[in-house]
Amino acid sequence: MLNFLKKIFNSSKKALRKARTIANKVQNLEAQMALLDDKDFATKTAELKKLFQEGKTLNQLLPEAYALAKEATKRVTGLTPYYVQILGAVILHQGNISEMKTGEGKTLTAIMPAYLNALSGNPVHIVTVNEYLAKREFEGSIGDVFRFLGMTVGLNTKDKDHAQKQQAYLCDILYTTNSELGFDYLRDNMEIEASNLVMKRPYSYAIVDEVDSILIDEARTPLIISQSVKETKNLYKEAQRFVRTLKNRHYLIELETKTIELTEEGITKAENFFQIDNLYNVEHASLLHHVKNALKAAFTMHKDKDYLVDYKDGQVLIIDQFTGRALPGRQFSDGLHQALEAKEGVLIKEETSIGATITYQNFFRLYHKLSGMTGTAKTEEDEFRDIYNMEVIEIPTNVPMIRIDEPDFIFVSLKEKYDALIEEITSRHKKRQPILIGTTTVEVSEIISKKLKKHSIKHEILNAKNHSKEADIIAKAGLKNAVTIATNMAGRGTDIRLGEGVKELGGLAVLGTERHESRRIDNQLRGRAGRQGDPGYSRFFISSEDELAQRFGGTRIEKIISLLQKISDSETKTSSKMVTKFFTKIQKKVESSNFDYRKYLLKYDDILRIQREIIYNQRKEILVSNRVEQIVQDLMQKTLNKAILPHFTNNPTQCQTQTLITFLENKFFPKQTFDLEEVQELCNNPKTNSLDSFQQHLLQKVKXTLQSQKDFFEKDPDKAQYFAKGLKWITLKIIDNYYQRHINDMSSLRQGIGFVSYGQQDSFIEYQKEGQVLFNNMIAKIANDITATILKFSFADSFXTPPKQKVFLNNDSSDDESSKKRRTRKVRTSKKPWN
């Protein structure tokens, strides 16, 4: 293990050393670039693009391109990128993560690698965590830097219409959010008109801002385009009515994993309540699913921590556990959201089925090159390396960091902790020092707010109930007298700049009300203070009654803290490296557990990923092809040849002709397509291979059918193009219908496969095996349906507008206009299941 850690550390140092060599070359060109006129920058860009087309590599162009971008940044924004920002930019170009502390200028850093990679002619996507940041960079001076350099810049947000999205995706540089990128990908892969695709270029390079938030915190969040399904709402209400009758002895909660199950006594109670013999009988699978969701909703999901209730609009809102923001329009998956609605007595919305889905883990792995920036990635470097093949390189700060990080204050009870916290706030507020108070839940933020009001301390509160003015509140958090309470969000993407005279007061004071289960979130909170060499202060206040201590420490930590207080002769606050290490150990344990779980889920998701890429690849070929008639003909020929094989099993020179004709006319062809005597002659001729002869006969039937349909359209020149469009429409609609069913079948399989472990079988192997069977069956049904539909029925006037799809994130619906937008992705896999 020690050797492994040394190897990682040395590789990081080596990467930084190489980056310094390159950065020095960039710096050496500074004087040369300063001599350029403003009009020369676009000309230089054209020259660099030409050099790339003539064979120069991006690595060879890097020094000049970075120097040019650096000078352009200086002229447009008035800010000159620091040497350390050039280092960060080199790391980004190499497809790695630049860990840059708060205030070190990640925004300027991204300009250089984005510009360089756009010289290749392929698009560069700069991904932000919210639309505010994407719009800010696109509309502001950062976007102007690219325009000054002769690059086109686009913005991709929910409010953009279809034409605007298409135009944005054609730009050299695209500012976008992660969710909009993913939804455009899914929408494009449900499109039936090639002209409607919004993404017609390859996924070449992405720079992900706050990369840990998107690729770690939201890694498990599935992007889903979904449709409503018919589902009785009474089951949710009945299941909720049942769980309200339960006592502690009826269920078991595992605090570490937050899972809940009925005990034997609880199962018996359920069977009596619902008047059934066996709750786990397959016929009661739906009831069991509803009961489990009701249990989770009642005992593991907490209002104002996991979700909010908007009684005015009658809805349950998810709280993002990593940002503290409410997520309007989203739903918890698998019926859990409906269970919460039943619990809170608001209108129960329809449950949904999945039309298309992808996780951020798999979506961002579609890029040829991926890089990212954040101030807090080192604690997750194993995951970035294992899942995304990216190294985390710590970039030195421009000036030394002088923030004072004090040891945690520890307490036995919450009351003692809150009293000490208010005392600290009051003391610092009297000096007019700005204070940022970090909480982990909305509930705690409101408790602190009430206590501050009692002490007549004016403050701002920033949580899921009040985030509309987030940027404005955070921007003012560094002024004298400012007291700001922030829930898990401390305004990432917006710097807290110190007001006049604040440095003399010690800078911004950051006070954490408890440890988060992730060290990264704690580090993000600390990182709000001490930017760019400013003074700052941070300390956490923790108690044995904190959730983290309760889940993992139990009474043990309470006894330790009580003992320490006696030893230190303090009735309340004390500090201890041992207790701090204990909490850090818990955090590492949780982080490791979460990483293992994400890897575990990714293993399952990879099965669906392979299947999705096969389907989307074939679908894309059909959608954009100008030879769809040949593709369909090949598919039909292959399908029919396979279908008739059982009729020639015993003897390839003969078969039961009437049985064969009946089979083909029932399944694929119109009645009276085949002449009995002709088929008898083909199938029972001892001088020829009957199977080969009949397969050629079938091919002629297919060609004749397609030609007659084509002739029908070509009678009218205005309708000539409808034949190919009709073939595409039928083929794509059948693929989509079956694939959407398949996704839901795979989801059901995933939910139910856990039970096989009881039979001493590996659940993943079973999922893989059963998933392959489902996929193969789907492929066969698609091929059969396409063949039968085209051969049996006329499709001359079968064009119809496809239904609107609803967009879902975390299985959450969103009825806004963004559901109309589309986009595509070139999938690397080239497997073709039908031809």
Swiss-Prot record:
Keywords: ATP-binding, Cell membrane, Cytoplasm, Membrane, Nucleotide-binding, Protein transport, Translocase, Translocation, Transport. Gene3D superfamilies: Helical scaffold and wing domains of SecA, P-loop containing nucleotide triphosphate hydrolases, SecA, preprotein cross-linking domain. Its EC number is 7.4.2.8. ATP binds at Q85, G103, E104, G105, K106, T107, D495. InterPro entries: Helicase_ATP-bd, Helicase_C-like, P-loop_NTPase, SecA, SecA_CS, SecA_DEAD, SecA_motor_DEAD, SecA_preprotein_X-link_dom. Residues 820-835 have a biased composition (Basic residues). Residues 806-835 are annotated as: Disordered. One of its GO terms (molecular function) is ATP binding. GO terms for biological process: intracellular protein transmembrane transport; protein import; protein targeting; protein transport by the Sec complex. It is a peripheral membrane protein. It is found in: Cell membrane; Cytoplasm. It catalyses: ATP + H2O + cellular proteinSide 1 = ADP + phosphate + cellular proteinSide 2. Monomer and homodimer. Part of the essential Sec protein translocation apparatus which comprises SecA, SecYEG and auxiliary proteins SecDF. Other proteins may also be involved. Part of the Sec protein translocase complex. Interacts with the SecYEG preprotein conducting channel. Has a central role in coupling the hydrolysis of ATP to the transfer of proteins into and across the cell membrane, serving as an ATP-driven molecular motor driving the stepwise translocation of polypeptide chains across the membrane. This is Protein translocase subunit SecA. It comes from Onion yellows phytoplasma (strain OY-M).
